[in-house]
């Protein structure tokens, strides 16, 4: 009796014999959002396995932090998620303030909220427009980056730097905002909804955009709990989990805002959630500006004491202040021994810092919880069974940045 398989194999063409093959996606692929390398096992166009390789941007941040003072460590946080730098600084400052028991002045707290929401919009503009570009729409990035440029100028006017601001400080913020800047931010916040509407009109009901995103990369509630997702990845699946509401920090409990949630947990729902979050952030920005202008919003922006420098006028008249200033910037302040976890609702998810202090002027150990790291580990689970073209859409809505993933 003849073995039928032999004849079948002979009938296969050369192309059919190599249907199952491995390809490298990245690390210099434009849709890889940084230095991501995916090793994909494909069956024709269908992804059978996806293996993310990370570490190409590893700089040993956590180890470097152990040999720097607390203040010198602050700029490292700008370089983690460099799309929305101030949100990362916020977590570091909160961790130090928890251990030292410092009370942040009300005005500084409101300025922090204002710039955290500006950071959220910076992040979501970049994410939505590059997501559109990944699936073939080239107009949104041109509109979005024009708005990001305006926000970068606000960063520069507040701190002197467009990107790596180092503006938040343990105990408050570096300096007060000029009144003209607050006016300009308010003017911008009234104009920006028009841009959101333009992008909305271009993408939301667009047939091609919908086909490329709907029912792609679905995340269930079980996935969320198993993989430790946070941020938009959770809210896109219908769970209203937001640290600003669930565990209010700074003064978010004084603000009135909604938490947008999706229904299906796919790429399209995550896009819709980000669009609505930008509108909610604008509402928070306008509320923060109103509070900053109110009489109770006036005052100092730093909790003057051991961990913050004295004012310039004090240093001109008091020798103690001058000595304090010198010691603060040479030796640095000492943080009481203990351990603490502080987290913020960063644009990408829950960004946390687990800080272990040993009573010296340098941290004993600092562990950074980057939301993107936990999202990327589910890449295999989310892309399995999808087409190769869908991999770019899934990475896009995961919102990964390799500064924080590789750290």
UniProtKB/Swiss-Prot annotation:
Principal localisation: membrane
GO molecular function, one term: quinone binding
Its membrane topology: Peripheral membrane protein
Entry-linked Pfam families: Complex1_49kDa
Keyword NAD applies: yes
Disulphide linkage map: none
Reaction it catalyzes: a quinone + NADH + 5 H(+)(in) = a quinol + NAD(+) + 4 H(+)(out)
EC number(s) on file: 7.1.1.-
Gene3D superfamilies in the record: Cytochrome-c3 Hydrogenase, chain B (1.10.645.10)
Keyword terms, alphabetized: Cell inner membrane, Cell membrane, Membrane, NAD, Quinone, Translocase, Transport, Ubiquinone
Root EC class: translocase
Domain of life according to the entry: Bacteria
Subcellular location field: Cell inner membrane
A single cellular component GO annotation: plasma membrane
Family: Belongs to the complex I 49 kDa subunit family.
Annotated function: NDH-1 shuttles electrons from NADH, via FMN and iron-sulfur (Fe-S) centers, to quinones in the respiratory chain. The immediate electron acceptor for the enzyme in this species is believed to be ubiquinone. Couples the redox reaction to proton translocation (for every two electrons transferred, four hydrogen ions are translocated across the cytoplasmic membrane), and thus conserves the redox energy in a proton gradient.
Self-association state and partner proteins as the record states: NDH-1 is composed of 14 different subunits. Subunits NuoB, C, D, E, F, and G constitute the peripheral sector of the complex.
UniProt cross-references to PANTHER family, sorted A to Z: NADH DEHYDROGENASE [UBIQUINONE] IRON-SULFUR PROTEIN 2, MITOCHONDRIAL, NADH-UBIQUINONE OXIDOREDUCTASE 49 KDA SUBUNIT
Name of the protein in its database record: NADH-quinone oxidoreductase subunit D
